[in-house]
């Protein structure tokens, strides 16, 4: 124990050894002293430990309506999909809290299948759900997976991504969310079972079955293929929520045929031919997924099916401006840091939305379009201190014209509006 330094007559911290002159405060106990820096360090350690314990528990899971309200802050439209997701997620974590059994009734897991076109918000919905619940989240691409023993990734590597997202806290990872994208790409090549091996299609579905349902999986800590001379991380997937998303191009034709077969008959109207793609997707059933190429066992482990609509121009404009992390808000903030006000005219927003629709990229393509428009602006503006405002017009987006600039002396420059 450190007490008095006989030469200098000073007290020292019993933990770090610093003298009372080197710290702001020294607290005395029975024959022991601790400085304010060590107290702060101990507090952080305790808070971190307690915080980790609290995050693993899900005693206050938001109600479905609360989940949908928070989703509305980040994701525009897709109301039916939000409602389906909110109920499924609430029931999933309610099941975890009840230890999966209520009065000897076993509650099964509600994994989710998201069906919708590219850029409709499938990944964003899954990410936002994980953020709401404060659980680890991982994204995997189904196209990179192959059956064990073939070139490609093992399905266990999906679990490794989740463990890494949880900072290797396995208990925390066991209550996380995994989003598997492009799940439609692992559909088998034909509806009838093949005698040839389909290692990146049906083989992947077979490999995913166990982890979707719930099993104790052995995960290589460094990823890659398993070999017998390495240690494994054991993780129970029973309480991991799996969300599988895909565009399922062509499934609307399968739905249309099913609906058409049911309405064809004497004196009946074939309404299926008149239904829009979005309306058809909302009528998807497990039997349609079976005809598309998913195996029955795989479909059975994804009991919740939610369909997303193609985003129209109005929805894309709202995505640009309304969410908390809207792209327009982000770019305005970036220019604000250079003391320049940024404005997007309504016509400019409409033109950006039209370009995204033309490219068939949905909301996913909005950022690259704005980045192209803003490149010269963000390159030149930091070097100029005479600009007060930058206005992105419809002509800037549609025709590539320079944006309108308002100088600090009131002069307006650009697009035939030069004035003093």
Swiss-Prot record:
Keyword hit for Zinc: yes
Listed CDD domains: RecA-like_ClpX
PROSITE patterns assigned to the protein according to its UniProt record, in alphabetical order: CLPX_ZB
GO biological process, one term: proteolysis involved in protein catabolic process
GO cellular component, one term: HslUV protease complex
Entry binding sites for ATP: 117-124
Keywords noted in UniProt: ATP-binding, Chaperone, Metal-binding, Nucleotide-binding, Zinc
Entry annotated with the keyword Chaperone: yes
Ranges in a coiled coil: none
Oligomer and partners: Component of the ClpX-ClpP complex. Forms a hexameric ring that, in the presence of ATP, binds to fourteen ClpP subunits assembled into a disk-like structure with a central cavity, resembling the structure of eukaryotic proteasomes.
Similarity comment: Belongs to the ClpX chaperone family.
HAMAP family in alphabetical order: ClpX (MF_00175)
Protein name per UniProt: ATP-dependent Clp protease ATP-binding subunit ClpX
Protein source organism: Bacillus velezensis (strain DSM 23117 / BGSC 10A6 / LMG 26770 / FZB42)
């Amino acid at each position: 124990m450190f007490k008095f330094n006989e030469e200098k007559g000073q007290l020292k911290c019993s933990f770090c050894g610093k003298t009372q002159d080197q710290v702001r405060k020294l607290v005395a106990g029975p024959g022991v002293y601790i400085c304010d820096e060590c107290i702060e360090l101990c507090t952080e350690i305790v808070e971190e430990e307690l915080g980790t314990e609290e995050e693993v528990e899900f005693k206050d899971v938001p109600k479905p309506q609360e989940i949908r309200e928070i989703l509305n802050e980040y994701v525009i439209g897709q109301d039916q999909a939000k409602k389906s997701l909110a109920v499924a997620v609430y029931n999933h974590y309610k099941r975890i809290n009840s230890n999966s059994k209520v009065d000897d009734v076993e509650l099964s897991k509600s994994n989710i299948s998201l069906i919708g076109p590219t850029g409709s918000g499938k990944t964003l919905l899954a990410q936002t759900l994980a953020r709401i619940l404060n659980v680890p989240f991982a994204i995997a691409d189904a196209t990179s997976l192959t059956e064990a023993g073939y070139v490609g990734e093992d399905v266990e590597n999906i679990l490794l991504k989740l463990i890494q997202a949880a900072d290797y806290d396995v208990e925390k990872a066991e209550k996380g969310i995994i989003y598997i994208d492009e799940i439609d790409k692992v559909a088998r090549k034909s509806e009838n079972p093949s005698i040839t091996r389909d290692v990146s299609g049906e083989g992947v579905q077979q490999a995913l079955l166990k982890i979707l349902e719930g099993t104790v999986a052995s995960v290589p800590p460094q990823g890659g293929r398993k070999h017998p001379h390495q240690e494994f991380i054991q993780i129970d997937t029973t309480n991991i929520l799996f969300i599988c998303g895909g565009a399922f191009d062509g499934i609307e034709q399968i739905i249309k045929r099913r609906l058409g077969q049911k309405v064809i008959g004497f004196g009946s109207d074939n309404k299926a031919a008149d239904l829009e793609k979005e309306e058809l997707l909302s009528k998807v059933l497990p039997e349609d997924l079976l005809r598309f190429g998913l195996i029955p066992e795989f479909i059975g482990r994804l009991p919740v099916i939610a369909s997303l609509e193609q985003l129209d121009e109005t929805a894309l404009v709202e995505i640009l401006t309304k969410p908390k992390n809207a792209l327009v808000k982000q770019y305005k903030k970036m220019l604000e840091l250079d003391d320049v006000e940024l404005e997007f005219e309504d016509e400019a927003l409409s033109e950006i939305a039209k370009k995204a629709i033309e490219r068939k990229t949905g909301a996913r393509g909005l950022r690259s379009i704005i980045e192209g428009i803003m490149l010269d602006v963000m390159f030149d503006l930091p070097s100029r201190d005479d600009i007060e405002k930058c206005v992105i017009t419809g002509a800037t987006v549609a025709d590539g014209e320079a944006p309108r600039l308002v100088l600090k002396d009131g002069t307006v420059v650009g697009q035939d509006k030069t004035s003093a």
